[in-house]
């Protein structure tokens, strides 16, 4: 839940975040580092001391300067970089993850940080492969546009599996058939508004119905600070997602918002903590069976005509009915399929 995107004073930012979360009694399981903190071992040490995992931003670029520095005896033709169809000496920055040496490059880029305690993170920019390129597996860019994501995801899976024994989490914004075997997904850059939240529930349920069960969002939007009410509804929404995480350029730290936000943050933080065993167990079940962690109403209740087309409710982990409030309102009409429903927050029962 924590964010540290600061390029300056990363140690001070990390220390302050840990102290303030501790004061609230809501210590996060992960702090996301981007900027100076991602390369500072002291920041990792502070997190490790509190048993907080560190994640970072990743992209698929292999920079020529880095490649020449680390592979001085090789020319571009031999490097795991995407080549121009007409001139193999002309390379794009995109890593060629079909190449046998791609994993060794990732180890050089990320290996030291993984040894410090890095445990995955965002794997970004998965949809930009140029058409006029050729890969080591012989396929051209027009055929690899989607499939590159599969190789990209597998490369990071192989990297972290080998170096951490499987104790990691990576999530991508791109996907293709089969890439969910290697990584999770997040629904991409979103607006910091109620409309942005509505887009995420549609995107997440579409992902789930397509076989991508484990997903999350940039809580509260990518850019600029959301209004307090949007933050609250986004946080409640994320509580009932497979992956609960913050993200984006603007702060999502609760103390940067009003008192009501902080109270809601604490309440739903502990609700999530108490649901974790169920969520973890159902994630394993979902991975083995293909049954989504978030089921659209039509999928969960195919016999109910009233459920069809309902895009603002879903069933989470097979037994929690979640109904979003994605507008400035305190109440919402909720459709309850036949059965007995118990409130999570009081002793109310609906039949």
Predicted regions mapped to residue ranges:
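Catalytic-domain carbohydrate-binding cleft regions of carbohydrate-active enzymes
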Residues: 1-351
């Amino acid at each position: 839940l924590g964010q540290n995107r600061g390029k300056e004073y990363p140690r001070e930012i990390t220390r302050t975040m840990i102290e303030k979360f501790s004061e609230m009694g809501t210590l996060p399981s992960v702090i996301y580092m981007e900027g100076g903190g991602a390369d500072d071992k002291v920041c990792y040490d502070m997190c490790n001391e509190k048993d907080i995992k560190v994640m970072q931003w990743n992209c698929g670029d292999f920079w020529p300067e880095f490649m020449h520095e680390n592979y001085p005896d090789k020319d571009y033709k031999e490097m795991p970089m995407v080549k121009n169809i007409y001139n193999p000496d002309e390379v794009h920055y995109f890593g060629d993850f079909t190449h046998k040496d791609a994993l060794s490059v990732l180890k050089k880029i990320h290996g030291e940080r993984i040894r410090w305690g890095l445990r995955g993170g965002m794997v970004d920019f998965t949809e930009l492969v140029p058409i006029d390129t050729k890969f080591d597996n012989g396929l051209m860019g027009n055929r690899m546009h989607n499939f590159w994501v599969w190789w990209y995801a597998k490369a990071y899976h192989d990297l972290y599996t080998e170096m951490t024994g499987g104790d990691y989490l990576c999530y991508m914004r791109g996907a293709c058939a089969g890439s969910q075997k290697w990584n999770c997904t997040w629904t991409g850059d979103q607006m910091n508004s109620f409309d942005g939240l509505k887009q995420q529930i549609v995107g997440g349920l579409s992902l789930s119905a397509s076989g991508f069960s484990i997903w999350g969002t940039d809580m509260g939007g990518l850019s600029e600070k959301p209004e307090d009410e949007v933050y609250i509804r986004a946080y409640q929404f994320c509580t009932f997602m497979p992956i609960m995480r913050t993200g984006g350029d603007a702060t999502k730290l609760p103390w940067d918002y009003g008192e009501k936000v902080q109270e809601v943050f604490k309440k739903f933080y502990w609700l999530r903590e108490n649901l974790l065993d169920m969520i973890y167990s159902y994630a394993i079940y979902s991975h083995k069976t293909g049954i989504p962690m978030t089921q659209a109403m039509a999928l969960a209740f195919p016999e109910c005509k009233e459920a069809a087309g309902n895009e603002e409710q879903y069933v989470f982990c097979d037994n929690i009915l979640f109904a979003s409030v994605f507008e400035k309102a305190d109440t919402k009409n909720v459709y309850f399929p036949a059965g007995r429903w118990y409130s999570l927050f009081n002793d109310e029962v609906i039949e």
